[in-house]
Amino acid sequence: MIDALDVARMDRFWLDATRGRTGGLQLRFVPTMKPKAAHKNRLHLDLAGGPDWEAEVARLLTLGATRADIGQGDVPWDVLADPEGNEFCVLRPGHPGVLADSGLVAICLDVSEEERYAQRAFWQSQADWHAVESHDWGVRLRRAPASTVSLVMGPPAAPKEARNRLRLEVTQRDREPGEFLDASGNEFHVTG
């Protein structure tokens, strides 16, 4: 779920940005009156840039994205922000773990080095996703080995400055619906 000042605009932007390819996951926008307060979101989305990633970045900029500098330095991806300032990355060809040429390919959760294994265990139990990679950069979970979208957790962890604008939502039939905190204090939602 993504907090949005203008739900219709954000829904349209992300539908176009992902080309409707979200690996079966739903991006849900929740109305809010509060603009983004944190310097950097603790959760962000990664899109595949495809073989012509420069053209994909240009396309996203024409949709309303802007370039963003979060101190990333020289990295093999481009950091952009959606129309409400939420950062997302456009991964270049050959990026490890990318199983699609376009659309949403990762949900990235900032966690500290010390918390990543606890977070892996936590999200495996909450979402029933499975670890497929574990490296010094973090861990990657998928619903199934061929799922195009992964949950990537790793450092550096952005400081918790405010309520997260982007939050994970899971469906659990055996748990009371509501908002909860994960092992690092990130809000997430449970639906029945």
What are these model-derived regions, one by one?
Residues 40-44, 102-106, 163-167:
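Short, solvent-exposed beta-strand edge segments and adjacent coil->beta transition regions
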Residues 14, 45, 123, 168:
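Terminal peptide-recognition signature
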Residues 1-24, 30-39:
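Hydrophobic, helix-prone linear segments
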Residues 16, 24-30, 61-111, 125, ...:
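Vicinal oxygen chelate
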Residues 20, 117, 133:
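Structured alpha/beta or helical-core interaction and ligand-binding surfaces enriched in interleaved
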Residues 3, 46-50, 110, 169-173:
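Short hydrophobic/aromatic beta-strand micro-patches
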Residues 118-126:
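Short acidic/Ser/Thr-enriched loop-to-helix initiation segments
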Residues 8-12, 52-57, 115-118, 174-176:
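Short, conserved charged micro-motifs
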